[in-house]
Amino acid sequence: MEEVTLVITSCGRFDLLKRTLDSFFEKNTYPIKKIIITEDSTEGKKLENLISQYENKYNFCLIINETREGKLKSIDKAYNEVDTEYIFHCEDDWEFLKEGFIEKSMKLLKEEPKLLTVGLRSKKDFKEDFFMKEEYVSKDGERFYEVNEEIYTYNPGLRRKSDHDLFGSHEKLKDKLYEMELSKFYKDRNYRTIYFKEKYVEHIGDKRHVHFSRKGKNSILDFKIDRMVKKIRYTFLKLFGKVK
Protein backbone atom coordinates (compact mmCIF):
# COMPACT_ATOMS: atom_id res chain seq x y z
CA MET A 1 0.00 0.00 0.00
CA GLU A 2 1.32 3.44 -0.96
CA GLU A 3 2.23 5.63 1.99
CA VAL A 4 0.70 9.06 2.59
CA THR A 5 1.82 11.99 4.76
CA LEU A 6 -0.71 14.57 5.93
CA VAL A 7 0.72 18.12 5.87
CA ILE A 8 -1.21 20.94 7.56
CA THR A 9 -0.17 24.60 7.63
CA SER A 10 -1.48 26.31 10.77
CA CYS A 11 -1.29 29.82 12.20
CA GLY A 12 -2.93 30.35 15.57
CA ARG A 13 -6.50 29.41 14.68
CA PHE A 14 -6.55 26.46 17.04
CA ASP A 15 -10.33 26.20 17.23
CA LEU A 16 -10.46 25.80 13.45
CA LEU A 17 -7.50 23.43 13.45
CA LYS A 18 -9.31 21.21 15.95
CA ARG A 19 -12.38 21.09 13.70
CA THR A 20 -10.13 20.25 10.76
CA LEU A 21 -8.37 17.44 12.61
CA ASP A 22 -11.54 16.00 14.18
CA SER A 23 -13.38 15.88 10.87
CA PHE A 24 -10.34 14.46 9.04
CA PHE A 25 -9.93 11.68 11.59
CA GLU A 26 -13.65 10.93 11.43
CA LYS A 27 -13.95 10.82 7.63
CA ASN A 28 -10.54 9.64 6.43
CA THR A 29 -10.40 5.90 5.75
CA TYR A 30 -6.82 5.60 4.42
CA PRO A 31 -3.76 4.92 6.64
CA ILE A 32 -1.60 8.00 7.29
CA LYS A 33 2.09 7.38 8.00
CA LYS A 34 2.82 10.77 9.57
CA ILE A 35 1.04 14.06 10.28
CA ILE A 36 3.22 17.15 9.87
CA ILE A 37 1.85 20.43 11.22
CA THR A 38 3.69 23.72 10.81
CA GLU A 39 2.69 26.47 13.26
CA ASP A 40 3.47 30.04 12.17
CA SER A 41 1.93 31.86 15.16
CA THR A 42 4.97 30.93 17.32
CA GLU A 43 2.48 29.61 19.92
CA GLY A 44 3.96 26.15 20.17
CA LYS A 45 2.56 25.37 23.61
CA LYS A 46 -1.01 25.90 22.42
CA LEU A 47 -0.44 23.58 19.48
CA GLU A 48 1.17 20.96 21.71
CA ASN A 49 -1.77 21.13 24.12
CA LEU A 50 -4.19 20.55 21.26
CA ILE A 51 -2.21 17.69 19.75
CA SER A 52 -1.88 15.99 23.15
CA GLN A 53 -5.51 14.92 22.65
CA TYR A 54 -4.49 12.78 19.68
CA GLU A 55 -0.80 11.92 20.01
CA ASN A 56 -1.31 8.38 21.34
CA LYS A 57 -3.32 7.53 18.22
CA TYR A 58 -1.29 9.22 15.47
CA ASN A 59 2.33 9.92 14.56
CA PHE A 60 2.78 13.71 14.71
CA CYS A 61 5.69 15.90 13.67
CA LEU A 62 5.24 19.50 14.89
CA ILE A 63 7.27 22.33 13.37
CA ILE A 64 7.01 25.55 15.40
CA ASN A 65 8.33 28.74 13.81
CA GLU A 66 10.13 30.89 16.39
CA THR A 67 9.22 34.00 14.39
CA ARG A 68 6.46 34.45 11.82
CA GLU A 69 7.77 33.20 8.49
CA GLY A 70 4.63 32.87 6.38
CA LYS A 71 2.99 30.07 4.44
CA LEU A 72 5.67 29.47 1.83
CA LYS A 73 8.58 28.90 4.24
CA SER A 74 6.31 26.78 6.39
CA ILE A 75 5.42 24.59 3.42
CA ASP A 76 9.08 24.14 2.53
CA LYS A 77 9.88 23.11 6.11
CA ALA A 78 7.05 20.58 6.15
CA TYR A 79 7.78 19.06 2.75
CA ASN A 80 11.44 18.63 3.68
CA GLU A 81 10.23 16.16 6.33
CA VAL A 82 8.11 14.12 3.92
CA ASP A 83 9.43 10.66 3.03
CA THR A 84 6.33 9.20 1.37
CA GLU A 85 5.28 9.00 -2.26
CA TYR A 86 2.06 10.91 -1.63
CA ILE A 87 1.18 14.03 0.34
CA PHE A 88 -2.29 15.04 1.42
CA HIS A 89 -1.92 18.82 1.70
CA CYS A 90 -4.32 20.74 3.92
CA GLU A 91 -4.75 24.03 5.76
CA ASP A 92 -6.13 24.64 9.25
CA ASP A 93 -9.64 25.72 8.24
CA TRP A 94 -11.42 22.85 6.50
CA GLU A 95 -14.17 20.46 7.52
CA PHE A 96 -14.26 17.02 5.91
CA LEU A 97 -17.70 15.75 4.99
CA LYS A 98 -17.45 12.32 3.32
CA GLU A 99 -15.27 9.23 3.37
CA GLY A 100 -13.00 7.80 0.69
CA PHE A 101 -11.41 10.97 -0.68
CA ILE A 102 -7.80 9.74 -0.47
CA GLU A 103 -8.48 6.31 -2.01
CA LYS A 104 -10.51 7.78 -4.86
CA SER A 105 -7.92 10.51 -5.50
CA MET A 106 -5.05 8.03 -5.50
CA LYS A 107 -6.78 5.80 -8.03
CA LEU A 108 -7.09 8.76 -10.39
CA LEU A 109 -3.48 9.90 -9.87
CA LYS A 110 -2.25 6.38 -10.61
CA GLU A 111 -4.11 6.11 -13.88
CA GLU A 112 -3.03 9.56 -15.15
CA PRO A 113 0.62 10.61 -14.46
CA LYS A 114 -0.10 14.20 -15.53
CA LEU A 115 -2.92 14.67 -13.05
CA LEU A 116 -1.60 17.15 -10.48
CA THR A 117 -4.31 16.81 -7.84
CA VAL A 118 -8.01 16.09 -7.39
CA GLY A 119 -9.97 18.93 -5.80
CA LEU A 120 -12.51 18.29 -3.05
CA ARG A 121 -14.45 21.57 -2.97
CA SER A 122 -17.87 22.24 -4.43
CA LYS A 123 -18.15 23.67 -7.94
CA LYS A 124 -20.31 26.41 -6.41
CA ASP A 125 -17.23 27.82 -4.64
CA PHE A 126 -15.71 28.95 -7.94
CA LYS A 127 -16.45 31.38 -10.74
CA GLU A 128 -18.24 30.06 -13.79
CA ASP A 129 -15.13 30.12 -16.01
CA PHE A 130 -12.91 28.33 -13.46
CA PHE A 131 -13.73 24.98 -15.05
CA MET A 132 -13.60 23.92 -18.70
CA LYS A 133 -16.83 23.29 -20.55
CA GLU A 134 -15.66 19.80 -21.48
CA GLU A 135 -15.52 17.38 -18.56
CA TYR A 136 -12.70 14.99 -17.69
CA VAL A 137 -13.60 11.31 -18.05
CA SER A 138 -11.67 8.67 -16.09
CA LYS A 139 -10.85 5.21 -17.44
CA ASP A 140 -13.89 3.72 -15.74
CA GLY A 141 -16.17 6.36 -17.24
CA GLU A 142 -16.67 8.62 -14.24
CA ARG A 143 -16.93 12.33 -15.04
CA PHE A 144 -15.14 15.18 -13.25
CA TYR A 145 -14.87 18.94 -13.57
CA GLU A 146 -11.54 19.95 -15.14
CA VAL A 147 -9.83 23.21 -14.13
CA ASN A 148 -9.17 25.73 -16.85
CA GLU A 149 -6.12 27.76 -15.79
CA GLU A 150 -5.51 27.79 -12.00
CA ILE A 151 -4.55 24.14 -11.69
CA TYR A 152 -2.39 24.54 -8.55
CA THR A 153 -4.03 25.01 -5.17
CA TYR A 154 -3.11 24.84 -1.49
CA ASN A 155 -6.64 23.67 -0.73
CA PRO A 156 -7.06 20.09 0.56
CA GLY A 157 -5.98 17.45 -1.92
CA LEU A 158 -3.74 14.47 -2.58
CA ARG A 159 -0.58 15.04 -4.61
CA ARG A 160 2.66 13.28 -5.48
CA LYS A 161 5.85 14.27 -3.68
CA SER A 162 7.69 13.88 -7.01
CA ASP A 163 5.47 16.51 -8.64
CA HIS A 164 6.24 18.93 -5.82
CA ASP A 165 9.96 18.26 -6.22
CA LEU A 166 9.80 19.29 -9.89
CA PHE A 167 9.35 22.90 -8.76
CA GLY A 168 11.31 22.76 -5.53
CA SER A 169 11.22 25.42 -2.81
CA HIS A 170 8.09 27.59 -2.66
CA GLU A 171 9.86 30.38 -0.78
CA LYS A 172 11.18 31.75 -4.07
CA LEU A 173 7.58 32.77 -4.87
CA LYS A 174 7.29 35.16 -1.90
CA ASP A 175 6.96 38.32 -4.03
CA LYS A 176 4.65 36.75 -6.61
CA LEU A 177 1.09 35.49 -6.97
CA TYR A 178 2.26 32.05 -5.99
CA GLU A 179 -0.68 29.85 -6.92
CA MET A 180 -0.81 31.48 -10.35
CA GLU A 181 2.94 31.02 -10.84
CA LEU A 182 2.72 27.39 -9.79
CA SER A 183 -0.27 26.83 -12.07
CA LYS A 184 1.68 28.20 -15.03
CA PHE A 185 4.72 26.05 -14.18
CA TYR A 186 2.72 22.83 -14.12
CA LYS A 187 0.40 23.73 -16.97
CA ASP A 188 3.45 24.36 -19.18
CA ARG A 189 4.40 20.76 -18.40
CA ASN A 190 0.96 19.47 -19.41
CA TYR A 191 -0.38 18.81 -15.93
CA ARG A 192 -4.10 18.93 -15.23
CA THR A 193 -6.32 19.27 -12.16
CA ILE A 194 -9.82 17.92 -11.76
CA TYR A 195 -12.54 18.15 -9.10
CA PHE A 196 -14.98 15.57 -7.86
CA LYS A 197 -18.60 16.28 -8.67
CA GLU A 198 -19.53 15.57 -5.05
CA LYS A 199 -18.31 17.85 -2.28
CA TYR A 200 -15.89 16.37 0.26
CA VAL A 201 -14.86 19.50 2.17
CA GLU A 202 -16.28 22.78 3.43
CA HIS A 203 -14.18 25.89 4.00
CA ILE A 204 -14.66 27.10 7.60
CA GLY A 205 -12.13 29.95 7.63
CA ASP A 206 -14.21 32.69 6.03
CA LYS A 207 -13.59 36.06 7.74
CA ARG A 208 -10.67 34.48 9.66
CA HIS A 209 -7.93 34.95 7.05
CA VAL A 210 -4.44 35.13 8.58
CA HIS A 211 -2.66 38.34 7.67
CA PHE A 212 0.96 38.12 6.58
CA SER A 213 2.59 41.13 4.92
CA ARG A 214 5.17 40.42 2.27
CA LYS A 215 6.88 43.70 3.10
CA GLY A 216 5.95 44.37 6.74
CA LYS A 217 7.53 43.15 9.96
CA ASN A 218 4.68 40.80 10.90
CA SER A 219 5.08 41.26 14.65
CA ILE A 220 3.46 38.77 17.02
CA LEU A 221 1.50 41.61 18.68
CA ASP A 222 0.02 42.73 15.35
CA PHE A 223 -0.87 39.13 14.56
CA LYS A 224 -2.62 38.59 17.90
CA ILE A 225 -4.63 41.81 17.61
CA ASP A 226 -5.67 40.94 14.06
CA ARG A 227 -6.61 37.41 15.14
CA MET A 228 -8.67 38.65 18.09
CA VAL A 229 -10.64 41.16 16.00
CA LYS A 230 -11.38 38.59 13.30
CA LYS A 231 -12.41 35.94 15.81
CA ILE A 232 -14.86 38.32 17.52
CA ARG A 233 -16.34 39.30 14.16
CA TYR A 234 -16.51 35.65 13.11
CA THR A 235 -18.32 34.71 16.35
CA PHE A 236 -21.04 37.29 15.70
CA LEU A 237 -21.39 36.29 12.04
CA LYS A 238 -21.68 32.63 13.01
CA LEU A 239 -24.30 33.49 15.63
CA PHE A 240 -26.47 35.01 12.90
CA GLY A 241 -25.80 32.21 10.41
CA LYS A 242 -23.62 34.26 8.06
CA VAL A 243 -20.65 31.86 8.17
CA LYS A 244 -20.17 28.14 8.91
Descriptions of predicted regions:
Residues 99-117:
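Conserved donor-nucleotide/metal-binding helix-loop-beta segment in metal-dependent transferases, i.e.
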Residues 19, 149-152, 156-162, 166-244:
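C-terminal catalytic/acceptor-binding lobe
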Residues 13-28:
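Short, well-formed alpha-helical segments that are part of the catalytic scaffolds
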Residues 3-5, 34:
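Cell-envelope/extracellular polymer assembly enzymes that use nucleotide-activated donors
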Residues 66-81:
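Glycine-rich, basic loop-to-helix element that forms the pyrophosphate-binding segment
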Residues 118-131:
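Short beta-strand-to-loop element that shapes/binds the nucleotide-sugar donor at the catalytic cleft/hinge
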Residues 85-95:
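Short beta-strand-to-loop acidic/aromatic patch adjacent to the donor-nucleotide binding site
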Residues 24-63:
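Acidic donor-binding segment of Leloir-type glycosyltransferases
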